[in-house]
Amino acid sequence: MATPTFDLADLKRRMQGAVNALKHDLGSLRTGRASPTLLDPIQIEAYGAVMPMAQVATISVPEPRLLSVAVWDRGMVSAVEKAIRESDLGLNPMTEGQTIRLRIPEMSEQRRKEMVKVAHKYAEEARVAVRHVRRDGLDLLKKLEKDGAISQDDEKRQADQVQKITDQHIAEVDQTLAAKEKEIMQV
């Protein structure tokens, strides 16, 4: 059996993965501003299969509170419109030829606060994921030191590096959350 080795770059990659997942999750949160990622969860029944919106249309933001969905195939317009209406986003599509316009309504203060709570939940999940990666790294270092593969000084030095990159990624999570919270609360 091969002896496990400590790879700091792998830990960084895994921690960054948690941060990227947070950014993706926060991107799908409705903020009262138009964002193409708002339509990511919507699936369209097309050509005998279910596919994401991005595979049947181009989504653009002509105004801060307006999404424009340019459907590529004229025959798909009604399916896209139906999927938008049936989604839980509460959007009312207005169709003009092959283009569907979606006005993004203002969110109430209560709804904004609910969205901030959801954003905090996502951020906490990301922090926990980063800490799990840190724990995995520290456990491996302790095992390597116990097995005599590295010295106690090396274990301490590497553990300090793991803590440093953990702190950096937690700070990135906090910055991402603060930016999203500001965006949500903006009227």
From Swiss-Prot:
GO BP: cytoplasmic translational termination
InterPro entries (UniProt xref): Ribosome_recyc_fac, Ribosome_recyc_fac_dom, RRF_sf
Entry's Gene Ontology cellular component terms: cytosol
Main location: cytoplasm
Record carries keyword Protein biosynthesis: yes
Keywords on record: Cytoplasm, Protein biosynthesis
Subcellular location: Cytoplasm
Family in the record: Belongs to the RRF family.
Function: Responsible for the release of ribosomes from messenger RNA at the termination of protein biosynthesis. May increase the efficiency of translation by recycling ribosomes from one round of translation to another.
Annotated protein name in UniProt: Ribosome-recycling factor
Organism: Methylobacterium nodulans (strain LMG 21967 / CNCM I-2342 / ORS 2060)
